[in-house]
Amino acid sequence: MKNVTDSFVSLGHWPSAGSFGFNTDILATNPINLSVVLGVLIFFGKGVLSDLLDNRKQRILNTIQNSEELRGGAIEQLEKARSRLRKVETEAEQFRVNGYSEIEREKLNLINSTYKTLEQLENYKNETIQFEQQRAINQVRQRVFQQVLRGALGTLNSCLNNELHLRTISANIGMLGTMKEITD
């Protein structure tokens, strides 16, 4: 503490200013010069420094504000993009579901129409088989009838002689006459 007070006391003892020149005593001149320079710098530089700091502060605030606005715009665009993405995903899901359901519906329609066609073909086949069976039965009947008729004619021709033939005709005429009398 004593050193500090001694330095202030030594400041009070100025050598007489008889001439202007360089003072080579660093300890005596530097604190005074430094205090004067610092005082002038603080007095005049305070406004300049304050203006520089205010300008810098304003630029930083403007940059922050612009960044916030850009950030807000980017967030808004991001939300719009997300919304569009959700909408497109929903539409894609609907198209996929509708496509699958349409495919399933077409598949069922195709299966049903194929089943109906097969059923119709089965019915047609059964009808054709029945028709062919009936036709074959009729042909067999005709052939059997023709063979029986030929056999009967052959038997009649071989068994019948003229006298038997005349008796059969007379008997038949007699039966017809009796039937006529009954009906009259």
Curated annotation (Swiss-Prot):
Its main location: plastid. GO terms for cellular component: chloroplast thylakoid membrane; proton-transporting ATP synthase complex. It is a single-pass membrane protein. Pfam families: ATP-synt_B. InterPro entries: ATP_synth_b/b'su_bac/chlpt. The keyword tRNA-binding does not apply. It is found in: Plastid, Chloroplast thylakoid membrane. Keywords: ATP synthesis, CF(0), Chloroplast, Hydrogen ion transport, Ion transport, Membrane, Plastid, Thylakoid, Transmembrane, Transmembrane helix, Transport. It comes from the Eukaryota. PANTHER family: ATP SYNTHASE SUBUNIT B, CHLOROPLASTIC. Belongs to the ATPase B chain family. F-type ATPases have 2 components, F(1) - the catalytic core - and F(0) - the membrane proton channel. F(1) has five subunits: alpha(3), beta(3), gamma(1), delta(1), epsilon(1). F(0) has four main subunits: a(1), b(1), b'(1) and c(10-14). The alpha and beta chains form an alternating ring which encloses part of the gamma chain. F(1) is attached to F(0) by a central stalk formed by the gamma and epsilon chains, while a peripheral stalk is formed by the delta, b and b' chains. In plastids the F-type ATPase is also known as CF(1)CF(0). This is ATP synthase subunit b, chloroplastic. The gene is atpF.
